[in-house]
Curated annotation (Swiss-Prot):
GO terms for molecular function: ATP binding; magnesium ion binding; succinate-CoA ligase (ADP-forming) activity; succinate-CoA ligase (GDP-forming) activity. Its cofactor is Mg(2+). GO terms for biological process: succinyl-CoA metabolic process; tricarboxylic acid cycle. Substrate binds at residues 264, 321-323. Belongs to the succinate/malate CoA ligase beta subunit family. Pathway: Carbohydrate metabolism; tricarboxylic acid cycle; succinate from succinyl-CoA (ligase route): step 1/1. Binds 1 Mg(2+) ion per subunit. This is Succinate--CoA ligase [ADP-forming] subunit beta. It comes from the Bacteria.
Amino acid sequence: MNLHEYQGKQLFAEYGLPVSRGVAIDTPEAAAEACDRIGGDCWVAKVQVHAGGRGKAGGVKLVKSREEAKVFAVNWLGKRLVTYQTDASGQPVGKILVEACTEIERELYLGAVVDRSSRRIVFMASTEGGVNIEQVAHETPEKILKASIDPLVGAQPFQARDLAFRLGLEGDQLKQFTHIFIGLAKLFQEHDLALVEVNPLVVQKDGNLLCLDAKINLDTNALFRQPRLRAMHDPSQDDPREVHAAKWELNYVALEGNIGCMVNGAGLAMGTMDIVNLHGGRPANFLDVGGGATKERVTEAFKIILSDAKVKAVLVNIFGGIVRCDMIAEGIIGAVREVGVKVPVVVRLEGNNAELGAEMLARSGLNIIPASTLTDAAVQVVKAAEDNP
């Protein structure tokens, strides 16, 4: 679960981390009032969405009057922001963060994630702040500095000082960076976070450090013991198809292609998407119905896939182990009849009761295309999508 920037900064402030004075608003009038409350003669207005790239998409603006802040709010509230991290429809804008301006000397990066290989929280820092850190890691990995946190003793000041020296900080900045580092580590552990990022962590003209941005991702599995953070969830930022899928314990991620995929097992689902791509197709989604698939869940999976208007064909790839292929076939038949599927459906069944499942599909009288192998299935579904403009 993601938090908005303004929510992340509220948490930062509670842990004593330096953040800009700001106000989250949801009306144009409140935007003008926020400028008065903050004071000064210039402010930064930032739309609040769960996506990066806001600045390049016009969602961040320096405003120099109350009226300019109000106009920015009028232009964005209730609209959708499209960035390189969103789909073509973008994310809805329900709030805008108005902040005091900051005079920036340098931009750094500081973040932490759970490293699955070491099973520890790992902090990452870089002199390349304010840019896409994944790009920095790919192009200049030597610029990514790391510190692994021992779960028995927690984050240590010496680790912070080591990173600070290597970032080129000096004097009182070392103490400030250590305070931020220890505070983020404490925040991470006490709130069951999966990721926290300060990008950029800036050195101001006066030499002091400031957390200019806040990105927080919570471990969804731990939300039951974080009721306060759970209440911060903004459902407007969720894809309604993914919300629907979660209710049926389906793992669904929307993509940009036109071939719907329904598979049991995450590994097989990724392999299916790869082979569809290999044969010139573009998957419209990742959908894992899981090992405990039922007729009802298969029906709901079809509804979710077909709610995407871009889908021109559907590939069902099932390996029967725990789940029986005949039960999946029954679900497919019921779903096609109930939903009224209008696009070609290619089905490949293998494993437990696969032959029985194939017979049921053949006897159904429905326009379902059988496939004998995964390659055959990929070739057929790509052709079907191309033939269905």
